[in-house]
Design a protein with these regions (language model features):
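Extended catalytic cores of very large enzyme megasubunits
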Residues: 1-371
Length: 371
């Protein structure tokens, strides 16, 4: 294999469009081996600076070769952001996260995490969304104007302020003049700016949602829609699509049918999230078949099924986790997560001609990458 590039056109396209950083001095994007060199150089410098630890030269080259040849893969968010972006905020190094929508700040935290390129799993189960404040009976136009700064932090802070004012009964104005125009180059994080229009759309969507919910609490579906709209805003900018999964109660009929019919025309933001029911105990056959029929009739294969009881049993089985947590999951649903936890994914690529020793070595190196 030519380590300068990847073996298939599809892999080359994904690398160039998602992970290769622009080299200004040479007016081109990185080749595959250069991307991994950047990742390895960053991690090596980070270990030395933060932990006074120098990677052994032999191990350094073993890790480099294994990644370049795709025997193992580190967190792909780290591969994408290694450099100034990851140095600025380690959130950008994690693949995924999970949080319940149980606090007004859940929405802006999800926005910030998504803008860092990290996937977000979230729950709109009633024991969480019922903790949110009640929307006032009336909403009044306020004189206050939210000035939105041109940064990930600025967008998230503006969203937090908008929600706080709406829950206090005020509809503010917002000033997006400081947000850079659409198409502007994002030098630190890579990609191009989405401009102010998506954020303006999000704010108007949230104001309308609050108006429709006056005098009561937001429903699970309304919380879900706001989270999905946040994801839609993030997908508009940069190069990383938002990855999201939404968990809901078995008895939540609104969420059961959230993605049926022509939802993609009427509520297009719902395309941003996979949806799954969160089982807390094994259902009887009638209950299971009712949900399964709904899944089949939706035409989208949703809602999927996440069994929290099995997650708790697995945590108890290995004795390394507190099994009493209400576990959630990441958007790919291959790992269980506690509320507000991140996921750091390393991968081992097993091939047909691998020996047991080959696989053991790959697992060892992948474990080092993820530690």
């Amino acid at each position: 294999m030519n380590v300068t590039n990847l073996p298939t056109y599809y892999q080359q396209f994904i690398h160039k469009s998602r992970y290769a950083r622009w080299i200004e001095s040479e007016n081109r994007r990185e080749e595959w081996d250069e991307t991994i060199s950047r990742y390895m150089a960053f991690m090596s410098a980070h270990l030395m600076e933060k932990h006074d630890y120098k990677i052994d030269n032999k191990l350094y080259h073993q890790l480099y070769e294994a990644i370049v040849k795709q025997d193992i893969m580190p967190s792909m968010r780290c591969v994408m952001t290694a450099g100034k972006a990851l140095e600025r905020d380690n959130t950008a190094g994690y693949n995924c996260s999970y949080l319940p929508v149980d606090d007004p700040k859940s929405f802006d935290e999800a926005m910030y995490i998504l803008m860092c390129g990290t996937g977000v799993g979230f729950s709109v189960e009633r024991n969480y969304v019922n903790k949110l404040p009640e929307v006032p009976e009336q909403l009044f136009r306020a004189e206050e104007t939210i000035i939105v700064s041109d940064s990930k932090e600025g967008w998230a802070k503006a969203l937090r302020k908008l929600l706080a004012l709406l829950w206090s009964g005020e509809i503010p104005n917002w000033d997006l003049s400081r947000v850079r125009p659409a198409g502007s180059i994002l030098k630190t994080f890579g990609g191009r700016a989405s401009g102010p229009a998506p954020l303006d759309s999000l704010f108007n969507f949230i104001v309308l949602t609050f108006k429709n919910a006056s005098g009561r609490k937001l429903s699970s579906l309304e919380c879900h829609d706001i989270m999905c709209k946040v994801g839609e805003v993030v997908v508009s900018g940069g190069v990383r699509r938002s990855a999201m999964i939404s968990l809901s109660n078995l008895s939540d009929d609104r969420m059961r049918h959230a993605k049926t019919g022509e939802f993609y025309k009427l509520q297009p933001q719902r395309q941003m999230s996979n949806n799954s029911v969160a089982y807390t105990e094994k259902p009887d056959m009638k209950t299971f078949m009712r949900e399964w029929l709904s899944l089949a009739e939706s035409g989208t294969g949703e809602r999927g099924m996440f069994y929290r009881g099995a997650a708790q049993n697995k945590a108890q089985e290995n004795g390394r986790r507190d099994s009493t947590w209400d576990f959630g999951t990441n958007p790919c649903s291959e790992i269980i997560l506690r509320p507000y936890q991140f996921c750091n994914l390393s991968e081992v690529i097993v091939r047909g001609d691998d020996s047991i020793d080959d696989i053991s070595k790959k697992v060892e190196l992948a474990t080092i990458l993820g530690t």
